[in-house]
């Protein structure tokens, strides 16, 4: 199967910090940067009980079926699915702190 490289945008909310362990909840995943920024701004304007939000751009190398699953079912995927990502580059784009 052919592999592709795509930029995927994640919005993650920091739920808990204990020492070097950070627990995050993924709030949004999309391949459209503009849409990700709009959702990030909307979520950042709301008051939450978290430590903050981060909008990150991941450059990922994978087969088309991997991207399909990631973009369509991101909220229901097991943690092991994310551990298999081949990340080419990571870049935080925006961050809020509580």
Q: Can you annotate each of these PLM segments?
A:
Residues 5-8, 33, 38, 63, ...:
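Intrinsically disordered, low-complexity repeat segments enriched in small/polar residues
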Residues 42-98:
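Short, mixed-charge low-complexity intrinsically disordered segments
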Residues 15-16, 36, 72, 94:
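Intrinsic structural disorder/low-complexity segments
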Residues 2-25:
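Short aromatic-glycine-(Arg/Gly/Cys) micro-motifs in beta-strand/loop hairpins
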Residues 21-22, 29-54:
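A short, charged, amphipathic alpha-helix used as a generic interaction element across diverse proteins
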Residues 5, 14, 28-30, 87, ...:
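Intrinsically disordered, low-complexity peptide-like regions
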Residues 12-19, 31-32, 54-62:
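Short, flexible beta-strand-to-coil junctions
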Residues 19-34, 66-75:
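Surface-exposed flexible segments
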């Amino acid at each position: 199967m052919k592999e592709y490289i795509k930029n995927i945008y994640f919005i993650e909310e920091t739920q808990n910090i204990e020492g070097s362990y950070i627990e995050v909840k993924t709030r949004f995943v999309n391949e459209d940067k503009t849409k990700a920024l709009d959702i990030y701004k909307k979520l950042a304007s709301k008051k939450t009980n978290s430590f903050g939000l981060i909008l990150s751009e991941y450059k990922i190398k994978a087969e088309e079926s991997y991207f399909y699953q990631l973009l369509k079912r991101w909220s229901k995927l097991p943690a092991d699915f994310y551990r298999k990502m081949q990340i080419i580059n990571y870049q935080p784009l925006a961050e809020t702190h509580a």
